[in-house]
Amino acid sequence: RIQIPVPPLEVQREIVRILDQFTTLEAELEAELEAELEARQAQYEHYRNHLLSYDSLATCGPVDMVELGSVVTLLDSRRIPLKKGDRVSGEYPYYGASGIVDYVDSYIFDEDLLLVSEDGANLKARTKPIAFSTSGRVWVNNHAHVLKVESSFYQKFLEEYLNSLDLEPYLVGSTQPKLNQSGLLSIPVPLPTEQALERSVLLLEKLKLFVTDFSAGLPAEIAARRAQYEHYRDRLLSFPEKLVSDR
C-alpha cells in the first residue's frame, strides 16, 4: 500500500497554484538567461567583425591581402582517420570536423596547430566554429584540415577571421558541403602589422571572456533555481500524519 496525503480541496488548489507559479518563473528565468547569452554572443560577433575588418586593421599600418596558402603550411598528409571500433580510449583528443569527437591512447601531432573543418553541414549552418586551435598532443582525422602557422598571434587571428567569414564561395557540393584544399588555401586573408595583430587578438580574448564567463555560470544558475523549486515543492507537499491516507 502507498500512503498519500489528502489535504482539503482548497489546500490542494493553492498548492497547485503556487507550484505552477514556480514552474512559470523558472521557465521565464531560463529563457531570460538564454536570451542574455545570445545577446552577448551577438555582441561579441559584432565587435569581432569590426576588429577584423580591413579599415580597423589599417589604423595601425598597411594591410596586405594574401591567399591563406601563402601564410600557412598544410599538414593534411599526416592525418589518419580511425573508425570508432579501431580507437582505443585514452587521454589524447581525437579531432574531426567539429572539434573533439573522442579521446584515444596515441597521437600524431605534438605542436600548435590550426584546424579547419573540411566537410559537413556546419560549413553552411555555422552553429559551431569551423576553425579551432589545438596545442600539444592530438590525433586528427581526415574531416579537418591541419594548418601550421608560425606566429601564435597570427594563428589566433586566422582562427577568428575564418570563423567570421562567409565560406559559401569556397565550398563545393550541395548535399554534403566540402571545403577542399584548393578552396581553403585560396581564401584571401589580411596580413596586418604586428601591432594590429596583437591589438586585435588581445581585445578579442577579453571580449570572449565576457561571453564564456557568463556561459560557464549559466548551468549553475539554472541548477540553483531548480533546487529552490524542489525545496519549496517538498515543503508544500509535506503534511501532518492525520492528512495521510492509505490507497
Where in the sequence are the language-model features?
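Charged, alpha-helix-forming regions
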Residues: R1-R247
